[in-house]
Amino acid sequence: MATTSMPLNKIDPRQRAWVEVSPDAIKANTLAIRSLLDEQCLLMAVVKADGYGHGSETVAEAALAGGATNLGVATLQEALELRKAGIVCPILVLGNLINPEDLDACIHWDLMPTLSSAREALLCNQIAESHDKEFCVHIKVDTGMTRLGCDLRLASELIQLVDNLKNLSLRGIYSHLALADVEANGQANSFTSKQKEKFETLLSSVMPRGKPLYRHLANSAGTLRDKGLHFDMVRVGLALYGYSPLKDLRNNFSLQPALAVRAKVTLLRDVPSDTGVSYGHTFITQRPSRLAVVGIGYADGISRALSGKMSVLIDGKFYPQVGSITMDQLVIDITESPQIQIGSVVTLLGVDGDSAITPYDWSEISGSIPWEILCSFKYRLPRVVI
């Protein structure tokens, strides 16, 4: 029978592995991004995917304290979690909502849906009529991403429809950049420039029907690279968390990483030369070695693709990870450092002393991208706000 003598909230979340999150860094990053914008240009903090793995409520509060005015999420559930946490600022649901019940929840909780079609507009108006309320919406237009958004050829017609529906209030028109993070700075005739031109052409054609409150196009890359992409509002995700998506301009901005992943050494092993390590024995010791087992694995978000290629930090010094990363554990070679003990803190991502490991490092090893890496840390890793 389970004992209840120790309250769960008394258990140290750092007993095995955890994620550290710095709201101060998020606030500082928001202020740094805010300084790049004209005074009248607003900043939407994109906090989808649980704030890119940092904790959406923590990120939202820090970003709003740093000058963000709006929040962007991908799903209705993400928006509802923020509302239930007491966050009252404008929230845009960036993903498509196709069920009447979802749109009903949107109007009840004062959330703004994204419209990509006439069907969605008519459904929103019908729901708003049933509540005898005005429904604030944004229209998304596809200028080259070929994902969500109204076909550009139908955009004027959709905007006119929304303008004519008495229970809808058009609060924004937006699009999304497809290549802003990969095109060279200042590249002539870039695809980003073409997207901007298409967006501006559309806006100029619909202005007689009334300018929407927000026109927005720029993501983090567009925000950092080109002021001409800012319009009335920018949508910032990755940069909010301390990372520039622009490889050629990575060090040009005062951004602070807001997250670290740490774990503890759980066992020490002294093994002879020619000892196979972990599944498949992909690593064989070439000398008598001291190995440390670390309590974190791919079920926590440490990709198996990093096996035998990554390093970790202990007290500011790098140590190689060896053998296959397993579901719950990985192994590092600490032969040169006998002072490491069970319980020593291992930094897998983040700053330790004068050294650091970044999502860029992991992405270059694994073929992933920083966005995916930050979103990969699972529920088993408690978030510790520092």
UniProtKB/Swiss-Prot annotation:
N6-(pyridoxal phosphate)lysine: modified positions: 48
Q: Which UniProt keywords apply?
A: Isomerase, Pyridoxal phosphate
Q: In which pathway does it act?
A: Amino-acid biosynthesis; D-alanine biosynthesis; D-alanine from L-alanine: step 1/1
Active-site residue numbers: 48 (proton acceptor), 279 (proton acceptor)
GO terms for cellular component: cytosol
| A Pfam match | Ala_racemase_N
Q: Which GO terms describe its biological process?
A: D-alanine biosynthetic process
User: Which co-factors does it depend on?
Assistant: pyridoxal 5'-phosphate
E.C. designation(s): 5.1.1.1
Question: According to its UniProt record, which reaction does this protein catalyse?
Answer: L-alanine = D-alanine
- Region forming the signal peptide: none
InterPro entries for the chain:
Ala_racemase, Ala_racemase/Decarboxylase_C, Ala_racemase_C, Ala_racemase_N, Ala_racemase_pyridoxalP-BS, PLP-binding_barrel
Binding-site positions, substrate: 147, 327
Show the GO MF annotations. Answer: alanine racemase activity; pyridoxal phosphate binding
Q: HAMAP family attached here?
A: Ala_racemase (MF_01201)
- Name the job this protein performs: Catalyzes the interconversion of L-alanine and D-alanine. May also act on other amino acids.
User: Can you tell me which family this protein belongs to?
Assistant: Belongs to the alanine racemase family.
What is the official name of this protein in its record?
A: Alanine racemase
The organism encoding this protein is Prochlorococcus marinus (strain SARG / CCMP1375 / SS120)
